[in-house]
Each structure stands twice: as C-alpha cells, then as structure tokens.
C-alpha cells in the first residue's frame, strides 16, 4: 500500500484530497495543527501527523520521529497555504518558506520516495493580459473577447502578495536538486465546504448581485473534485518540474454566473448593482487597515481587490 502525506488536510481542498486518497487505497497521513478542525476527517483509516512548517529544527525532529516508526512517504500533496494574511511577510512565511522547508527536509531525511505535488494558484500569473484587444477597424473588442486569454507562454507577473508568495514557492522548489515535483495552478475552486463563493451565493439569495467595474469580467472555475482528481493524476503523470493551469475549460461572464446562481436557487428577482473600481479600492483599503488594527483578516482586502478588478481568463 502506497503511503501519502497530505498537507492542509483540514481545509476545503485538503479534506477532499484525504477522502480521495482513502478511496484509492492509500495509507493516508493528514497533516494538522493543534487547532485544526477534524469536522470532515472522521474516517478511522486516517492517520494524523502534526508538522511545524515554520521551524527547521522542530520539523526535522517531527519527521525523524515519524520515520523511525513508520518509514518514508511515497507521495506528498502539498495543499496547505495561506489565502489571507495581514502582510506580505506573513504570506511568504507560510506559502514560500513553509513549502520550501517541507520539501527540503523530506529530501534531507530521504523520506520521499516519489513525487511532490504542489497546489499553487492561477494568481501567480497576475494581470498579464489586461490591455484591451483592438479589432481591424481600431475599435475595442466587446464582451468576453475584450481581453486575450492567459496562456502557458505568459511570463508570470503576480500583482498580489498571495500570488507572489506562491510563485516564489514554485521557484524555490525548482532549486532543490533531486526533487521530483509538479505544480498545479488551479483557477477559482468551488464546491461543498467552500466559503468565499458561498458568500456570493448568499448575496444572490438575498436578492443582491454586487459587481465591480463596468466592463465584462471573464471568470474561470474548477470543481473541487476535479482538482482533486488532477492532483492524484499528477502523482504519476506530467513533466517533472512543470506547472499546469487547471480549469473546467469554460469561460463565464460574471453576469451569467450570477444569473446561473439565481436560477439554481430559485430566486425570483435580483437587484444587479455595479460599483466603480475606485469605490471597491477605497472599501478594501479601509478593510485592510481595520484588519491590521484588529488582527482579524477580512474577506475584502487589497489582495482581493486586485483579484476582483481583473478581467482576464484562461485560454
């Protein structure tokens, strides 16, 4: 029976990764913190392990003790990470340094027999395709064709602290000699247990559709179970050291997305409210300032502002 280590196991994606690992017959080890919830991790076949990805000495001791009793891992899926943080340094500590520390320690202790799959993000690309496309007559293209699609050929230019921390993690992994790894860059992930898209659905349920900007926004998504399937395929497939974008292959207009939510939930009417980008910028600035003062992260912050104002899509 192959042995797999899954980080971020108590999170949205991580809990589904654990379920899939058990379904496929893996000897499954779920990484948790002392404060982590086990709400979706109740299967008695799950083995739990506490790892401190923020401390070299502690992590080395924890993995060494594990190895003495249970041996090495055959595979690792690293899905842990911070999507919200008070500042860029905090993002780097978790997403960049934590990722590098885990992979490096596994290599140093010879505790990884197979592949390391890193769950990164589309956010590493940034706003690389934000200039409107002009048609032969000089006019700007309309609708979802207004901006060109993001492709593998684009050089990443992340415009958020989160995106920069994930890209730096990708680059850090590439410096580790002997590491067999693949990076997955999913677009927006939706499904049961997810909270951010739930907030949008809840807003529609309350008859309000709030949008930012007056030009069309192209949205791309991937269902959580499809992302999970891709993670397990990547254990065996994919070019070593390569990054792969993941989506369901469709492009959605932001209005069409809200209309779909309205239809599926049976909401009879919705007030569609559009706010200028400058207004969202002001709200996110204030929200970020309050978060710094209180120490509590808000869904609306300057990183989220960059994400919400972006118009582009995957090819």
Predicted regions and their residues:
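N-terminal Rossmann NAD(P)H-binding glycine-rich loop of SDR-like oxidoreductase domains
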Residues: 4-24
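N-terminal Rossmann-fold cofactor-binding loop
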Residues: 31-36, 53
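NAD(P)H-binding glycine-rich loop region in Rossmannoid oxidoreductase-like domains
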Residues: 51-97, 101, 124-127
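Conserved Rossmann-fold NAD(P)-dependent oxidoreductase catalytic core, especially the SDR/UDP-sugar
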Residues: 78, 100-161
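Flexible, glycine-rich beta-alpha linker
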Residues: 124-126, 182-199
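Active-site Tyr-X1-5-Lys
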Residues: 144, 148, 157-182
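Substrate-positioning beta->alpha
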Residues: 164, 169, 194-199, 213-235, ...
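Mid/C-terminal beta-alpha module of Rossmann-like enzyme folds, strongest
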Residues: 234-300
């Amino acid at each position: 029976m192959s042995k797999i280590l899954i980080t971020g196991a108590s999170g949205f994606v991580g809990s589904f990764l654990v379920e899939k690992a058990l379904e496929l017959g893996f000897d499954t080890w779920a990484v948790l913190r002392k404060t982590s919830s086990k709400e979706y991790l109740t299967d008695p076949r799950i083995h739990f392990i506490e790892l401190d990805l923020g401390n070299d000495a502690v992590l080395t001791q924890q993995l060494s003790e594990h190895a003495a009793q249970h041996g090495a891992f055959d595979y690792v899926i690293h899905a842990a990470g911070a999507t919200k943080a008070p500042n860029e340094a905090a993002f780097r500590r978790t997403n960049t340094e934590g990722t590098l520390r885990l992979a490096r320690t596994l290599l140093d202790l010879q505790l990884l027999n197979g592949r390391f799959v890193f769950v990164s993000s589309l956010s590493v690309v940034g706003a690389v395709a934000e200039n409107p496309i002009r048609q032969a007559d000089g006019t700007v293209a309309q609708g979802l064709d207004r901006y060109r699609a993001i492709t593998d050929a684009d050089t990443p230019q992340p415009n958020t602290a989160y995106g920069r921390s994930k890209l730096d993690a990708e680059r850090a992994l590439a410096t580790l000699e002997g590491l067999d790894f693949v990076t997955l860059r999913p677009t927006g992930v939706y499904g049961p247990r997810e909270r951010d898209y739930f907030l949008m659905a809840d807003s529609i349920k309350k008859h309000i559709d709030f949008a930012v900007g007056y030009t069309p926004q192209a949205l791309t998504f991937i269902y959580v179970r499809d992302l999970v399937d891709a993670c397990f395929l990547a254990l065996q497939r994919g070019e070593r050291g390569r990054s792969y974008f993941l989506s369901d292959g469709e492009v959605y207009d932001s209005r069409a997305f809200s209309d779909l939510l309205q239809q599926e939930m049976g909401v009879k009417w919705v007030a569609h409210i559009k706010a200028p980008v400058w207004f969202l910028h002001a709200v996110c600035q204030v929200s970020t300032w309050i978060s710094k003062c209180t120490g509590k992260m808000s869904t609306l912050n300057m990183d989220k502002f960059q994400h919400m104002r972006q118009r582009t899509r995957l090819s």
